[in-house]
Amino acid sequence: MKWILLVFGSVCLLDVVEDSFVHGKRNARTVTFSRTGRGQSRRRRDTWTTEKERFTECNTPLSVKDRELLRSHTHETGFHGDDGSSFTLTWAGNGTGIIFVLSTISVPSDSFYEGGSSRLYRSEDYGKSFHDISHAINNTFLNSYFGISAGHGNPQPVILTANLPFTKDPGGKIFTSMDAGLTFRSVQLQFHPAQAIQFSLLDPKYLVVISIDDGLWLSEDFGNNWSKVHEGVHTFTWGSENTLFFSSSPNGTVEAARRGELILRRTCDFGKTFDTIAENIFSFGHIGSFLFTSVMEKLGSPRVIYVSKDQGDHFKRAQLPSATTEQFYSVLDADEDMIFMHVDNPGEDTYYGTVYASDEQGILYSKSLERHLFGGEGKSDFTNITSLRGVYLTNILEEGGCIRSVISFNRGGRWRYLKKPENVDCPDMSKKCNLHIHGEHSHFSGVTPMTPSSEPTAIGLVIGHGSVGDSISAARPDVYVSRDGGYTWWGTLRGPHHYSILDSGGLIVAVEARRDRGISSIKFSTDEGQCWKTFNFTDHPFFLAGLASEPSSSTMNISIFGYRLDDNHKPMWVAVTIDFEHLLTRECNDQDYVTWLAHSNYSSNPKTDGCLLGYKETFRRLKTLSACRNGRGYVVSRQQSPCICTSEDFMCDYGFYWHENSSACLPQPDFLNQTQDFCLNVDLQTTGYRRIPGDKCKGSFSPPRNEEAHQKLCGNVTSSDSHTEIPPAILALIVVCSLGIICLVIIAAYMITSRRINCGQRSPEYNFSVLQIQEDDLSVNNESTPNGKLNGFQVQEDSDDVSLIKQ
């Protein structure tokens, strides 16, 4: 059975886009588990359609010695008497072993209780034991959404935010700690925070937050004292160094209906002075080196994107299709060199759009992928495979309603279908047969418990849920793994699982995802998912909530959270932490590693084999059969060498698209009329190709030149390339006539100026109707582009991105 788009339901995309944009992505240091279901609209995990087995899972027995060794390093904690409906885990620092667990239970607002209740636990041994420290904060009820904020640095700063009834208390309360929670200091606030307190990236003593009345509050002494520096603030984000960007209403209050009139402001001295760098914006964001905005240049016109790469000093309009009120933009991914932008397809609830890739300035965009899936709930499957440079994975919606997976190995320059796993048979040989990977859509809908996973230190390793066939299937998904960044795949686990990459890829753990019964065992692999061993970690099964491990993939501890009935037949939270470090005791040596050329297709040309974006990368990676420990100090070893330029180093230029049948970049018909304004201001010389941003290739290779490309794109705007020769006699006559005209203009200007000086007291007469139209146009333009600058929108990021811009 095929999975079609109907599973997305009728969720309003714009509302979800708004929420995702304001609140940002899930903190990489924080994970939340819940005992409640994900909603009736989600798919139950016991209602999948069934299909025959496509592959056989490889399992090897666990020796008695290893089983006893793991059992002696398995630690179970039962949170007796805790009736919290959700558990939120937050790690303090990297490699510290310190974890905070916030248990909360909320009650309806009309209940006779005030708010709800919470408990705070702390572990300093990677979750092997937890201690209730609620008394350290006087058993104060903490906010269930942003109760814990952990900053970077040593000592580890931690801030707890209380959940006080704002109808009774004039201000909120926080608890601050500079010793990772050993001690806390209570601070009474003058305001109620509306979101999590944000730390400065340079100095954790500098804090910023928005209050429930839209005030922007700053602290320069780690929360002891606060100053309200601005009113009517909608959202904010930190820029480079101590730069803070925020959008605000010109009238001091934020109204959703007036979001097209927001002002973008900037402060570089923690609120002492402000610069207005843009006006009339809808939203803004900062990711990588780019600051960008969504703007309506004229009343009633579609919205457009403006981009700055100098922290807001100057903005330029991005050459992208405009978006109507039914459409939206979404920044899928960005770094220092490039932006991937999704532009929604025209029409209501189309659930797909086009992905564009920018140049290094973020101004010119090339069409990278059409019919890119973007569901009504505001979720995109666009995934950066962090274990191998230049690799991106996503899904497209074909015209028949089928969803298929595609992958790019050169930063969106070319896309292709995924290869069928070597150990998997095709269900129907008469149809297309490829691997299709479930993404965020499936995770949100309850089809899969996790999204694809990769880690920068686990070179080439990718693991995710998928199905094999002509499109994504509604059947029970299996787990597939790739060890070369997505070029080839292997069926590794039958059925859906929770999984985690540990020890920089030297260890993978997985727990079967079930809702119909409890779990008691964990699977682990030391050969990149080729085979698995099973360890029973408890004699008392419990219902799985999820896995949790330190944000760094170098850890060898995994915590399994769930719940079961206690002796009084009440739900009880359970945490089981397994330390695999005592199983893999041998440190890896030189003999355990092998040299591996990334992106190699084993071609006959050694000069170009493995070349990607202008250079090769050779890694020293762990051998598949080496059962040893990389360790916390493991650093990826790589060697880079330059490559000569080939066609793979180029992508289609602005206004062109890749035509599969001709294998060439051809002009986009729908862009011919949209480029005229740009051509008037920029000498857009193009052959239809441009080098991929960040590409470092060397050599004299040039893509095939299309002599008519520029003329088709800019029409008759450019005349510098004209080859029409003018006879010398006619040219001399033109020069003489031009000089004569210039002299006449100078004389006339002198006479008019003299007359105006003599008649300075006269009242001028104007054509008011014409003048008013001109002033209205100028007024809108001046507000949209003050002093040649323009506006920006927020991407809250803990690493990666990606966020949404409501249009």
Q: Which residues does each PLM region occupy?
A:
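Extracellular glycan-interacting surfaces
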Residues: 2-807
